[in-house]
Every structure is written in C-alpha cells, then in structure tokens.
From Swiss-Prot:
Its main location: mitochondrion. GO terms for cellular component: mitochondrial matrix; mitochondrion. It comes from Saccharomyces cerevisiae (strain ATCC 204508 / S288c). GO terms for molecular function: arginine-tRNA ligase activity; ATP binding. Belongs to the class-I aminoacyl-tRNA synthetase family. It catalyses: tRNA(Arg) + L-arginine + ATP = L-arginyl-tRNA(Arg) + AMP + diphosphate. The lineage of its organism: Eukaryota, Fungi, Dikarya, Ascomycota, Saccharomycotina. This is Arginine--tRNA ligase, mitochondrial. SMART domains: Arg_tRNA_synt_N, DALR_1. Keywords: Aminoacyl-tRNA synthetase, ATP-binding, Ligase, Mitochondrion, Nucleotide-binding, Protein biosynthesis, Transit peptide. The gene is MSR1.
Length: 643
C-alpha cells in the first residue's frame, strides 16, 4: 500500500557468510584455472573419469567440472554393479545411501531397494566381486546391505586438496537452471515483544536461506512485519499521552511497547467503567480509519513508527548474522489484491454468506480444516484474506519457483487452511508453497523474569560469554575485540542450543548449558575452530600451495584418515539437510568433525615434525577448519579466529 522496503544498501546489514560472492549465481563455477589445478591432483587408479553428465538421476544437478569423491564412488559402484548384474545405473544410484556412522562405510546399498532375489546371498557374492573396482577400497556384506569404503589413497588425494582449493565453496553446488525461492521468516509485530517464536523463525529462516543458496537457488529473504491493524490506532493515541521523542529515537521497540502496554491499561479501565465506545477506543478507531483512508498525518505517524522499528530490527538482526532483501508487511498488501482474492472466491463458489460475513467451508475437503471467515459483516477483510492477496502479489512480482513460510507449529492449522484455499482457487503454483514449522521454546526469559526482547537475550548471552572469557587473562589479552568476540560466542550458543534437535521439538532454554565450553555447544564449536586457526598461524611457514600439493602417501594415521572420511561426507550432508530442511543435520555433523579433530589434535602433532610429515598433517587440519567454517556459516554463526 505504501511501498515495500527494498534494501539496496547492503552495508546496512550484517555480512552474509557468502557475501564475498555475487548476490545471485555466486555458487561454485569451477573455472578453468580451478579445473586444471584439480585435474593435476587427480590420481589415475584405473577408473573411468566421469563427467557430471553421467549423473542422470537425482544427482544430475552437479557443478560443471570435477565432482565430489563420494559422487565418484557412486558412479564406480553403479558401473560395477551394472556390469555384473545388468541392473540399471539409475536404480543403483538412487538406492545408495549416505551413512550416519563411519563403521558402516562411506556409502551403503540396501539390496532390497534394487529388488534382487535373496539379497543376503547376493550381498555376500557381490562383496567379493566388487572389492577391487575403481575407487572402491573395500566392500563388506552385512545381511542384505553392502557397505562401501573409498580407496584410502584416492580419498585423501581427492578430498583434502579439493577443500583447500574450493575454500568457502566446498560442499555447494551450482544448478544448471537456477530456481528462485522466497523465504518468509522472523515477521515480528511492531510494538510487541520480539518473542521466542520470532527468534526461532529468524534463525531457522536464516539457515534455510543460506542452505538454498548453497544448493544453487536464487534466494529472496523476506520479513513480513505485523505492521497494520487496530494496535496502531492505540499506539498513536498512547504516544500522544506517554510518548517521548528522545526515548523513541534511542529505543524504538522498547518504548513503543511500553507505550502500548500503558494505553492498553488505560483502555481496560475505561471498559470496566463502561466507556469502551468512546474515549481511547473511539480515538483509536478514528485514527486507524484515517490511516486506512490515506490521511496524510496518520500515514506520517504510522510510517515513522514503522521506519524506526525496521532500522532497529536491522541492527539487531546483524548480531544474528541475518539480513533481509525485503521488509514487507500486512500494510503492503494492496486493496486490489484482496479484492481480486474475494472475486476469485466468489467465481469459484468457495464462499457462503453467513450473518453478513463471507465464509469458506473447508470441511468438504478436510473435516479438520473447519470453516474460515474471509470477510466480516462490516466489509473488513481478515488476516487470511491479506495473506492470500500477498501470495498473489509475490507470484506476480517475484516469479518464484518456491515460497517457504517459516512459522511456528502453533499455526499448522492456519497454514493448512491457507494452502487449501489457494489450491481451491486453482492457482497452479499453490503446490510450490511450503510451511516449515517448529516447536516452542520453554522457559525463555531474562534472568530477571521480564518480558523477552531479543536484544536483551543477546546482551545476556554476550555478557555471560565475556565473563567466562575473562577467567583466562592470558588468552583474552590476545583477542583484539573481546566484546565483539563474546557477542559472536553468545549468538553461537543461542543458535546451536536451538538447532541441536529436530526443529519440530520443543526445548528448554537453559543459560548454563547453552554457554558451556564443555559438551556439544556453540562455544565448543567456536573453540575448535579457533584452535585450528591458531595451528595455522603457528605453522605459517607452510603456504597454502604447499598444503594443496602435499605428498599424502605417508599419511596413514587411522584417526586422520577417519577425519578425512568425515570431511568427504560434507557435500552429502548438505544434500541431506536440504531434503529434510533440518538444521540439526548440519549441527550433528559439525560435532562429529569437532570430536574427531579433538582426538587427532591430542596425538598427531604438526609442531616439531619434519616437513614431509608436518605438511600433509597440517593440510588435513586446515581442510577441517575450512569445513567447520563453511558449515558454521551456513547455520548463521560467524567463526572466530581467537577466543
């Protein structure tokens, strides 16, 4: 209605972990220089060199140029099995699974998936026949399953240099035909607390946006603010009574909330005294009516509250490493779009008039969806009608291939109603909408038990992290900006506590557990990353080029080999997270890498070793740090170098 806020000045926002690349189409392009470098590193182990064109199944969307080691293993397995059984390549490729445990191999093939008779006997026979084919290092039969292990020499030579060359691009892929996705997330209500549900929506939505980009999509991050409705009438009246310009400029969200609380208390007193139709209520209705009618003064007041709030939100979001391309809101949905929605309701015979209101009866398609009012008897539209209008506008203006709504599971019924209505309006693109839900945070409050504002939570996490850091005077003296680092550690603690389990699960917000440097926490991830950065700094005599071209022939320590196997899994982990839309998939993987790094770090040293031993070891540690950096950035964390 009054113009969507498009953020052209990206410097206002926190730097996106991928922002060193072009906004659209930054994904790995594998240019000629990279391809040549990689091919020089490839070793000839008697396997056919495959191109990405060979992958004609669910793995077709691979980057041009070299493919990841586990993809080569997939191809070698499918070729070998096809040669001995005649089974179609695509059936084998789609049946192969990643493993959750290293002792189960690098890839797993459940033989029942490819419909062979007597899968146990066949597994035993094939394990013998396949043991020396291509990059397959070992094959084990376990009941009806075949476990495949990469050839150790190929594993190390193809994985470690690959990571060091690709750096931040490792694990990502470039789609041949880039699709567009709109991710709507966060969506706080102006003048109301930024509560725990908004926090979850914000960090999960930020992760999903990063994940879609990593998988080759063009992403539009949208914040759909609660910036319209009767509360703005109350807010305007309240600000006349209790507003303070200086406080508004300094703390807009907090001050508007305080004003809103006070005016609601006054309103409650009026209602008790039987004056609800005049006084505050009447003034609020009058202001909002003027706002809807486009009154210049009302719009000026509303726009000021909204603009100051957005400016404050941007500052707060930057601490979470979150940015938005569009700040939209309920106010942005045009009357034309809502009228178009109502016209389609009537045209498709979806609405019935009940007591003057327009109602859609969804029980004819699903009993649980019930009836939905789309227009009140006085002619005003409801939230759902605005959402329908907004979806229509977004399809017209943004031309998305998919739109994702990151909204609490408390809204599951509402989102099902919304999607069903769009489907019955015969919008073909209704199938491209997805609701990503999540559970509730229990026990989330400040230590004083006050109303929760996001800034307060972030401040408390930072202060607690800083207090822990100050316990080690020697280490904190080496940190350039302890306050900033503490803020990053505090944010990491909040994000990882949230993302450790499946997003649909409720969880208990626990300050002490969240900020612990022991166990699987955000600070532990940061500690591992900074530890590896320290190793790189103390080994700076060895250049990146030396690490890329290291001789790995003598790298046989089992712990380091297991670490490289984990690093080789990262592209598959990204794919699995993309399929499930679960941040916990990435978090679980990160802790596996950290635990393996820790077991290696204690026993397998770089310092004091001759170059032919130190360089390949350092290459593995440096590749590990890069993968940690990539995965942490994907989750929305900013990895620290010192802490």
């Amino acid at each position: 209605m009054f113009g969507i806020v498009y953020l052209k000045n990206r410097s206002l926002l926190c730097k996106n972990p991928f922002s060193s690349y072009p906004r659209y189409g930054f994904m790995p392009s594998f240019d000629t220089q990279f391809s040549n470098q990689f091919r020089k590193l490839e070793i000839n182990i008697g396997r056919k060199r495959y191109s990405s064109k060979t992958l004609n199944t669910k793995y077709t969307d691979q980057p041009e140029g070299p493919i990841y080691p586990l993809d080569v293993l997939r191809l070698d397995i499918s070729k070998a099995l096809h040669d001995i059984s005649g089974i179609d390549h695509s059936l084998i490729l789609n049946a192969l699974e990643s493993t959750n445990s290293m002792d189960r191999g690098d890839l797993l093939l459940p033989l029942p998936k490819i419909k062979v008779a007597d899968p146990v006997a066949v597994a035993n026979r094939w394990a013998i026949e396949l043991s020396t084919h291509g990059c397959i290092g070992k094959v084990c039969a376990k009941g009806p399953f075949l476990q495949f292990f990469l050839d150790q020499r190929y594993l190390i030579q193809s994985t470690v240099p690959n990571i060091l060359l690709q750096k931040g691009k490792y694990g990502q892929k470039k789609s041949r035909h880039q699709k567009k996705v709109v991710v709507e997330f966060s969506s706080p209500n102006i003048a109301k607390p930024f509560h725990a549900g908004h926090l979850r929506s914000t960090i999960i939505g930020g992760f999903l946006s990063n994940l879609y980009e990593a998988m080759g999509w063009s992403v539009t991050r949208m914040n759909y603010l609660g910036d319209w409705g009767r509360q703005f009438g109350l807010l305007a009246v309240g600000f006349k009574r209790y507003g303070d310009e200086k406080t508004l400029q300094k703390q807009p969200i907090q001050h508007l909330f305080d004003v809103y609380v006070k005016i609601n208390m006054d309103l409650a007193k009026e209602e008790i005294n039987g004056n609800s139709k005049c006084g505050i209520s009447g003034e609020a209705r009058s202001f909002f009516k003027n706002l809807e009618n486009g009154d210049e003064n009302a719009i000026k007041i509303w726009n000021r509250f909204r603009s100051l709030s957005i400016h404050h939100y941007i500052q707060t979001y930057s601490r979470l490493n979150i940015n938005f391309d569009i700040f939209s809101g309920e106010s942005q949905v045009s009357k034309e779009s809502m009228n178009e929605a109502l016209d389609i309701f009537r045209k498709n015979n979806l609405v019935k008039e009940i007591d003057g209101a327009l109602v859609i009866d969804l029980t004819q398609w699903s009993k649980r969806l019930g009836r939905v009012v789309v227009q009140k008897s006085d002619g005003t539209t409801l939230y759902l009608t605005r959402d329908v209008g907004a979806a229509i506008e977004r399809k017209k203006n943004l031309h998305f291939d998919k739109m994702v709504y990151v909204i609490s599971s408390q809204q599951d019924l509402y989102m099902s109603q919304f999607f069903m209505i769009l489907k019955k309006m015969n919008f073909e693109w209704a199938k491209d909408l997805q609701h990503i839900n999540f559970g509730m945070v229990q026990g989330m409050s400040t230590r004083k038990g006050n109303v929760v504002f996001l800034d307060t939570i972030l401040d408390e996490a930072r202060d607690k992290a800083l207090q822990i850091m100050e316990n080690n005077k020697m280490k904190i003296s080496q940190v350039d900006n302890p306050q900033r680092v503490a803020d990053l550690i505090g944010v990491s603690a909040i994000i990882i506590q949230d993302m450790k389990s499946k997003r649909i699960n409720n969880y208990e917000f626990n300050w002490n557990r969240m900020l612990s440097f022991e166990g699987d926490t955000g600070p532990y991830l940061q500690y591992t990353h900074s530890r590896l950065r320290s190793l790189e700094r103390t080994s700076s005599d060895f250049t990146t080029d030396m690490l890329i071209h290291a001789d790995f022939s003598n790298l046989n320590e089992p712990q380091l080999v297991e670490l490289v196997r984990l690093l080789a899994q990262y592209p598959d982990v990204l794919r699995r997270a993309f399929e499930t839309q679960e941040p916990a998939t990435i978090v679980t993987y990160l802790f596996k890498v950290c635990h393996q790094v820790s077991s290696c770090y204690k026993k397998i040293w770089v310092s004091g070793k001759p170059a032919d031993i130190a360089i390949p070891r350092l290459a593995v540690y440096s590749a590990s740090r890069q993968v940690l950096h990539n995965a942490m950035s994907l989750l929305g964390l900013v990895p620290v170098d010192r802490m």
